[in-house]
Amino acid sequence: KGALLSHGNVGRLLTATAGEFNFGPHDVWTLFHSYAFDFSVWELFGSLCMGGRLVIVPYDISRDPQQLHRLLCDEGVTVLNQTPTAFRQLLPIACASPRTLALRQVIFGGEALEVASLRPWLERFGDQRPSLVNMYGITETTVHVTCRAIRLADLEGKAPSPIGLPLRDLRWYLLDSQLHPVPVGVAGELYIAGAGLARGYHGRFGLTAERFVPSPFDASQR
């Protein structure tokens, strides 16, 4: 996309999520995703800036859930980031394996998460360790906007894909085409404001002006 993100954008992402995850030197992360995918920014800097260890997953292992499970066990991985599609391939292998995983956080992103697909995992491992966390966001907002831990009770809940609440330094608004808040029950567009926004798109000034609009609620914000 050519989104212009600063070091400060990434730094504040780690600060804004510190209370939820308590990442530190005790953690072992995987670099599962291509560095062309924004999820890798979270993996790279989330591990190294917090003093953790980063295990680079070879491409062939990332496409083989049996080998991936073996790597997770052998390396003592504690933080795993996955798209829901990739995790669905790993799930049955982990649930059937006698080996113990060291995971304490599994973080989902990149696409919509269907909670019902996690039933076998939650029934096998529970919802505490590892904690399963759904994070929602896009490149233009520095990877993540919201955070929501998934619980066993969500299997019986009404929300098929709960995304939670914004990170503490972000705000969200559901607006119509005139940037007015929509009433409850009326469809609208989700707008994000706060410290995570990119500067814009590289060399695309028209698109930047179209997508990054002044906030109608705070003149100092977009």
Task: Give residue ranges: language-model regions.
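AMP-dependent adenylate-forming
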Residues: 10, 129-134, 148-222
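Conserved AMP-binding
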Residues: 33-37, 60, 139, 194
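Conserved pre-ATP/AMP-binding loop-to-beta segment of ANL
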Residues: 23-29, 35, 168-170, 184
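Short aromatic/basic micro-patch
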Residues: 4, 38, 62, 81, ...
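Conserved AMP-binding/adenylation subdomain of ANL enzymes
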Residues: 2-30, 38-78, 146-148, 152
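Gly/Ser/Thr-rich phosphate-binding loop
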Residues: 49-52, 77-81, 91-162, 171
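Alpha-helix capping/helix-boundary segments
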Residues: 85-87, 113, 197
